[in-house]
């Protein structure tokens, strides 16, 4: 695959990328990690480059790992929130994108609405990269696929069980990535909460082509039987506080605890994109226990960001 095909492209969601391109990002993530631990703390492919971080929503992992990633690639970051820019005073997303394109080499945007990303990409002349939206979280999915490859030695044929909120943005990106990479994904979620239908349709078609599968069930124990990976996320995301009580009651049977992990048959790892609401979607004994790959997964965000930025930033 020619790397020039990726240079300068937006990354709004993984539906725009082939399985081969996603796999290359995943493998480069682990290569970046190997080089880091071999002593290459700086790989200066972004020397002289500036990456803007435009965040409507606060972050620990995304912001810090991106700032460190750009530094380890020899570039530098400019962090912005709407209140610190004219976006907070009514300047349009389109005008902001045009202006930032004159100063920066790429924009990573963490936004409340996916439509904001799409509008930014329409008017920017530099890559716009999704650092999280209400619909998807592609950078997280790249790190997650790298973690699975690192822990299981393969992606094709891996059984991933996602237990919890079926409309979760991270799940959407796991569906888009995993279906193109040959994973067997089972989502256990209440019938009232389903993945975005457009994303589900794309994932089902991609799974047919890759030899993977996608299934939606309501029983968490059915989902995790024989699973290689059990994955969950918070039940109430930022901006959903008004529906917190109703959602928590609905999702209580979907808590990942030791009993559920033992039902996998003993070979599964546990993954969570963090932050975790301990005692809600996952218990301490799971996230801190022998199943947990969460801390390696969190570290791999750093290396995934290096991989993606090194491929996309011109």
Swiss-Prot record:
- Source taxonomy: Archaea, Thermoproteota, Thermoprotei, Desulfurococcales, Desulfurococcaceae
User: Its catalytic activity?
Assistant: carbamoyl phosphate + L-ornithine = L-citrulline + phosphate + H(+)
Q: Which organism is it from?
A: Aeropyrum pernix (strain ATCC 700893 / DSM 11879 / JCM 9820 / NBRC 100138 / K1)
> Which family, according to UniProt?
Belongs to the aspartate/ornithine carbamoyltransferase superfamily. OTCase family.
What are the protein's GO molecular function terms?
Answer: amino acid binding; ornithine carbamoyltransferase activity
Q: Where does carbamoyl phosphate bind?
A: 59-62, 86, 110, 137-140, 273-274, 301
- Enzyme Commission number: 2.1.3.3
- Protein name in the entry: Ornithine carbamoyltransferase
Its biological function? Reversibly catalyzes the transfer of the carbamoyl group from carbamoyl phosphate (CP) to the N(epsilon) atom of ornithine (ORN) to produce L-citrulline.
């Amino acid at each position: 695959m020619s790397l020039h095909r990726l240079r300068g492209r937006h990354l709004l969601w993984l539906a725009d990328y082939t399985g081969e391109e996603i796999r290359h990002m995943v493998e480069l993530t682990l290569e970046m990690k190997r080089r880091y631990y071999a002593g290459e703390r700086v790989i200066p492919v972004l020397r002289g480059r500036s990456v803007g971080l435009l965040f409507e929503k606060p972050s620990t992992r995304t912001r810090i790992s991106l700032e460190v990633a750009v530094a380890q690639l020899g570039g530098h970051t400019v962090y912005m929130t709407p209140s610190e820019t004219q976006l907070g005073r009514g300047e349009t997303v389109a005008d902001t994108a045009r202006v930032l394109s004159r100063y920066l080499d790429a924009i990573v945007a963490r936004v409340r609405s996916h439509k904001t990303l799409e509008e930014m990409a329409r008017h920017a002349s530099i890559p716009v990269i999704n650092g999280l939206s209400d619909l998807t979280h592609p950078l997280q999915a790249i790190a997650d696929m790298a973690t699975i490859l690192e822990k299981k030695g393969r992606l094709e044929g891996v059984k991933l069980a996602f237990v919890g909120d079926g409309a979760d943005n991270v799940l959407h990106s796991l569906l888009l990535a995993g279906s193109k990479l040959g994973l067997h994904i089972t989502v256990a979620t209440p019938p009232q909460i389903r993945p975005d239908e457009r994303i589900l349709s794309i994932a089902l078609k991609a799974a047919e082509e890759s030899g993977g599968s996608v299934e939606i069930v309501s029983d968490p124990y059915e989902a995790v039987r024989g699973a290689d990976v059990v994955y969950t996320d918070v039940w109430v995301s930022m901006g959903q506080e008004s529906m917190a009580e109703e959602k928590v009651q609905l999702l209580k049977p979907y808590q990942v605890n030791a009993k559920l992990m033992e039902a996998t048959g003993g070979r599964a790892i546990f993954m969570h994109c963090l932050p975790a609401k301990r005692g809600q979607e996952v218990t301490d004994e799971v996230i801190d226990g022998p199943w947990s790959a969460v801390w390696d997964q969190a570290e791999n965000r750093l290396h995934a960001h290096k991989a993606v930025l090194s491929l996309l930033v011109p």
